[in-house]
């Protein structure tokens, strides 16, 4: 499948999406610097989040409207979203800069108004966040745009995922990527369940990838071996700068390494082929083979003392050793002669 000009699939290197989230810390200048750094690291796409605090929650301090996550424990949801949101007037300059640097640029909408706003910017795709994968009306509204959908699967049961996928397809979605996701911040690798990736592809007949909140890049690189074709990571200039999502975001050197290592992992997958590869053919002549290891006169008997399996591989294969032992050579043979059938007549 294509998103813009990016090919998403197992015949192409994994697409790496850098998520800006709230790491701009309220500064457009910093947000643009993050975009430029992501491009310099080789990220293929930039993703924003499009909401306001009021479209996400209510401005209340009751317990159910406060965060229980260790990172944000006790803070009101409204306050968190007010701090983290990306002003809508920033979207156009951020998208423009990303495109200038060769990246795809899209966003996650959280309500109908944000879908309509993103449509006005002609985004090439939409992301559905894990916390919204049960919001079927929102999914239908996004699907009705006809744009590809990337959907995180965090917290969802199989039945809920089936409902979400069916809602998207019934409303017009033709290109879908499901991302294995653990909605914990940061996430413990023990709960990443990367083995779900091929299962998602099989069950829903779509591309599958990973939205990764673990620390480091190990889980992300490993996901490629299980068929991940798109990997999303939060990104910041420096975790020490702080910010609502900085604790589980990659820094530039990590993102650059992720781009390199996931491409290497994809290349290393290769194909199902048991047998020598093209680049191994020259090494076959350096394998073990049978050699005469003592000077022999005509009529001498071949024994373990004068016939051995050694490197290189210009003699008969070692599997013929037992057949040759006890045979007599028909002529004088010098030490270092590769064994051949004509030595015994």
For the regions a protein language model found, what residue spans apply to each?
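Catalytic cores and adjacent flexible loops of soluble metabolic enzymes
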Residues: 1-345
């Amino acid at each position: 499948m294509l998103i813009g000009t990016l090919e998403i699939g197992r015949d192409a290197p994994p697409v790496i999406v850098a998520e800006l989230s709230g790491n701009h810390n309220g500064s457009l200048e910093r947000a643009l610097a993050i975009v430029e750094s992501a491009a310099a690291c080789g990220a293929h796409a930039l993703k924003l989040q499009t909401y306001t605090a009021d479209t996400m929650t209510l401005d209340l301090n009751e317990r159910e409207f406060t965060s229980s996550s260790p990172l944000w424990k006790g803070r009101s949801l409204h306050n968190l979203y007010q701090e983290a949101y990306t002003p809508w007037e920033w979207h156009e300059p951020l998208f423009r800069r990303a495109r200038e640097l060769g990246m795809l640029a899209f966003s996650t909408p959280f309500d109908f108004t944000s879908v309509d706003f993103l449509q006005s910017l002609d985004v090439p795709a939409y992301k559905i966040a894990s916390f919204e994968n049960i919001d079927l009306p929102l999914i239908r509204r996004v699907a009705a745009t006809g744009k590809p959908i990337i959907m995180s699967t965090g917290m969802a049961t199989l039945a809920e995922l089936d409902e979400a996928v069916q809602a998207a397809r019934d409303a017009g979605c033709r290109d879908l990527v499901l991302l294995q996701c653990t909605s914990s911040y940061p996430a413990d690798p023990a709960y990443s369940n990367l083995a779900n990736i091929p299962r998602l592809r099989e069950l829903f007949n779509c591309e599958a990838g990973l939205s990764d909140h673990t620390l480091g890049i190990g889980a992300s690189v490993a996901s490629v071996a299980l068929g991940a074709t798109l990997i999303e990571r939060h990104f910041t200039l420096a975790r020490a700068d702080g910010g609502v999502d900085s604790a589980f975001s990659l820094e530039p050197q990590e993102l650059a390494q992720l781009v390199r290592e996931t491409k290497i992992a994809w290349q290393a997958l290769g194909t199902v082929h048991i047998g020598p590869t093209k680049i191994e053919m020259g090494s076959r002549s350096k394998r073990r083979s049978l050699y005469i290891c003592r000077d022999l006169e005509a009529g001498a008997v071949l024994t373990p003392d004068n016939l051995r399996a050694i490197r290189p591989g210009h003699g008969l294969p070692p599997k013929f050793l037992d057949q040759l032992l006890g045979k007599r050579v028909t002529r004088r043979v010098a030490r270092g002669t590769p064994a051949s059938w004509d030595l015994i007549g």
